């Protein structure tokens, strides 16, 4: 099993994916253990002094002016976890919770939180045991971080609340810890606050979204190329010299991908010297510009994610010179903004894919294809309602593109009077990515069927490889009407598991 070592200087996106999705084992580095102990020594020294220190000997949020006596401080830390574990709604996915916990452990190990080494080790032990706290959909405003979701995780650390075991059953967390030989932690000064004051949920979802969208943008380039081919479009617009004079990196990459997929096709318009069309519709001709802009959005979001993965987000933080200082680094705005940005880009990619699909089905714009790609139009409806489904998905994606980060709402008696809503931005982006996968799958279904209806013209070798593979995957080709939902589900799985990209790359080699 792969092992991820957590040190003091952050983690990588690959580390997050390995833990969240791959079940990688976690170890703490010796450097991290030393830093944890040193920071804890600073907190213990401050806790012994009469002066109040936020998070160590005071209340929280709007109650920060209350000085807490020594004998109540352990109760204070337990209470903040219990009271802040106030989430509601459906359970959050296992991979999201694992990413959330791992990223909190990353910050704890930075040596800036004052959490004891044994608490950090218990966090790692819970993840290694495959125990997943029950975290709910609603409860985070994205500032001070993802409070309620992280509190549910901290509750498990205390042996309280519910958690999911390795077998997928939900049981009392205390029972699961006992079965795996894990001793619940007794929280001390600052530890409760340090376990729940971070942007780890939204960051984990951002990292996973970037991985998913990387694959989807490649898939969308392939389906755009298939649609261009099916519509007898021209690939001249994909020429490298045209994209070099507007040098957006993503645009060039998408154009190169499409050109590679179309190499050797007999359907693209440049083979027809007397072709009356000199320009294709925008949804075909401008595919690299739209997908490329999305790719550049991914690059910006990835830069933000990398900075966050190298950050220590807590309030207050322990500094090497012995100070414990309040700060605003828990505000999720940097992450929230790019999550919203990605939702906008994803919605537009879905929109342009749907427009190409609609063009394939319209006999007045498809350049010789039968209405709705039907076998016997009138008797058969073909893919008419598949496009309805695609349109419904696009419509929802447009609603999901409305920025959550622009909708701050005050809380905590106006002490926390501006929040990021980054968790909400991340949740809606996950839905948008699911929708986009389905939209691309429907374009794939329509485009491969349309190419097969172009009898007498040989598609590009890469296109043929995709058609052959998707048929083997259970997606039926042209013919009389049949129950469509299973075909669409099979096409969705073909895109989702990477088979589409794999099939194309058997001919093209690695795509960008």
Curated annotation (Swiss-Prot):
It holds the Pfam family Lyase_aromatic. GO terms for biological process: L-histidine catabolic process to glutamate and formamide; L-histidine catabolic process to glutamate and formate. It catalyses: L-histidine = trans-urocanate + NH4(+). Contains an active site 4-methylidene-imidazol-5-one (MIO), which is formed autocatalytically by cyclization and dehydration of residues Cys-Ser-Gly. The modification 2,3-didehydroalanine (Ser) is found at residue 144. It is an enzyme of class 4 (lyase). Keywords: Cytoplasm, Histidine metabolism, Lyase. Its EC number is 4.3.1.3. It is found in: Cytoplasm. GO terms for cellular component: cytoplasm. Belongs to the PAL/histidase family. This is Histidine ammonia-lyase. The lineage of its organism: Bacteria, Bacillati, Actinomycetota, Actinomycetes, Kitasatosporales.
